[in-house]
C-alpha cells in the first residue's frame, strides 16, 4: 500500500517539473499593453501597461511612462498597421518622462491616468519596462497614440451654420408676405407722392420740362367739360331754389329752423308779397 502511494506521488512529479521548466524557459512579455484612443478635449483617460518577467525568481523591475509628442510623418502609416505593443521605432529627442514605478518581483503594472486632456496632450505615449534579471539590463517598450478632438467647432464654422440656418428658414417662411407688403407699401407711397408732383413748380432758371403730347388733349377735354358742369350745376340750383316771394312765405311758414315758428295768416302773406313787388317797381323807376 505504501509502495503504491509512493508511486502515485512520483506520478505527479513530471507535470510539476514541466510547469517549473516552462516558467523558467518562458520569455518575458507584456501581459497588458496600451491601445490607441481618441477622446474629446476635457475628457479623462487611462492607459494600462503590465509586464511579466521570465522565471519565477524575484527580480527588480522598473516601469516608466514617456510622452513622445507627435511621431514623424513617415511613421504614421507604420503606426496604423503595427501592433500597439510592438511599437519600438518611434523615438523623439524631446521625449518627456511622466512617471516611474519600481518593484521587486516578476510582475509589474502601472496605469497612466490623464485628466482633462488638452489638444497639446495629443501624441505617442510609451511604456518602458526595464528588466534587471540578467547582468545586461533588458528594456521592453509598448506605445499607443492619443488623439484629442476639439470640444467645440471653430468660430467660422459656427457663423456659417448660423447664416445657413437663417437663410434656409427666414425667406422661405416670410418671404412672400414680406414681398407683398413691400409692393403694397411701394404702391401706396407712389400714390401719395404723385399728386404732390404737380404742385411743385420748377426752380427759376431750370429748363422747361418736356410736354407730353397727350397733355393738351386732356386739358382741352377738361376745359370742354367744365362749362357743361357749371351750366348743369346752375340749372340744378335754380330748380332747387324757390322764388324770393315763395322763399319768404316758406321762411315765414316753416321758420328759419333755429327760432320759434309762428302761425301766419295766408292773406297777410299775400299782402306782404304784393307790397314787396310794388316796392321793386318803385325802385326800378
Curated annotation (Swiss-Prot):
Membrane topology: Single-pass type I membrane protein
SUPFAM superfamilies listed in its UniProt record: Immunoglobulin
Gene giving rise to this polypeptide: VSTM2B
Organism encoding this protein: Homo sapiens
Database matches in InterPro entries: Ig-like_dom, Ig-like_dom_sf, Ig-like_fold, Ig_sub, Ig_V-set, IgSF_V-set/TM_domain
Disulfide bond sites: 49-127
Keyword RNA-binding: no
Biased composition (Low complexity): 177-189, 208-226
Residue ranges annotated as Cytoplasmic topological domain: 285
Places the protein is found: Membrane
GO cellular component: membrane
Pfam family, one: V-set
Region (Disordered): 161-226
Name recorded for this polypeptide: V-set and transmembrane domain-containing protein 2B
Extracellular topological domain: 29-263
Membrane-spanning intervals of the chain: 264-284
Amino acid at each position: 500500500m505504501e509502495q503504491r502511494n509512493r508511486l502515485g506521488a512520483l506520478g505527479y512529479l513530471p507535470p510539476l517539473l514541466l510547469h517549473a521548466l516552462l516558467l523558467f524557459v518562458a520569455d518575458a512579455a507584456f501581459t497588458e499593453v496600451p491601445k490607441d484612443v481618441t477622446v474629446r478635449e476635457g475628457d479623462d483617460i487611462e492607459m494600462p501597461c503590465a509586464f511579466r518577467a521570465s522565471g519565477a525568481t524575484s527580480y527588480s523591475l522598473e516601469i516608466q511612462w514617456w510622452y513622445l509628442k507627435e511621431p514623424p510623418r513617415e511613421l504614421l502609416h507604420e503606426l496604423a498597421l503595427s501592433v500597439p505593443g510592438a511599437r519600438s521605432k518611434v523615438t523623439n529627442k524631446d521625449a518627456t518622462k511622466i512617471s516611474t514605478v519600481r518593484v521587486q518581483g516578476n510582475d509589474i503594472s502601472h496605469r497612466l491616468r490623464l485628466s482633462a486632456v488638452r489638444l497639446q496632450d495629443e501624441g505617442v505615449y510609451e511604456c518602458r519596462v526595464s528588466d534587471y534579471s540578467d547582468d545586461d539590463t533588458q528594456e521592453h517598450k509598448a506605445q499607443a497614440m492619443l488623439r484629442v478632438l476639439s470640444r467645440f467647432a471653430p468660430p467660422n464654422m459656427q457663423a456659417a451654420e448660423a447664416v445657413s440656418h437663417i437663410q434656409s428658414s427666414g425667406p422661405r417662411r416670410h418671404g412672400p408676405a414680406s414681398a407683398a407688403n413691400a409692393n403694397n407699401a411701394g404702391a401706396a407711397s407712389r400714390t401719395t407722392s404723385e399728386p404732390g408732383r404737380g404742385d411743385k413748380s420748377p426752380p427759376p432758371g431750370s429748363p422747361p420740362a418736356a410736354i407730353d403730347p397727350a397733355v393738351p388733349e386732356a386739358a382741352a377735354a377738361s376745359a370742354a367739360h367744365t362749362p357743361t358742369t357749371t351750366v348743369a350745376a346752375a340749372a340744378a340750383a335754380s330748380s332747387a331754389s324757390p322764388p324770393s316771394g315763395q322763399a319768404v312765405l316758406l321762411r315765414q311758414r316753416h321758420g328759419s329752423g333755429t327760432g320759434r315758428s309762428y302761425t301766419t295768416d295766408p292773406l297777410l302773406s299775400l299782402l306782404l308779397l304784393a307790397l314787396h313787388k310794388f316796392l321793386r317797381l318803385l325802385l326800378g323807376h
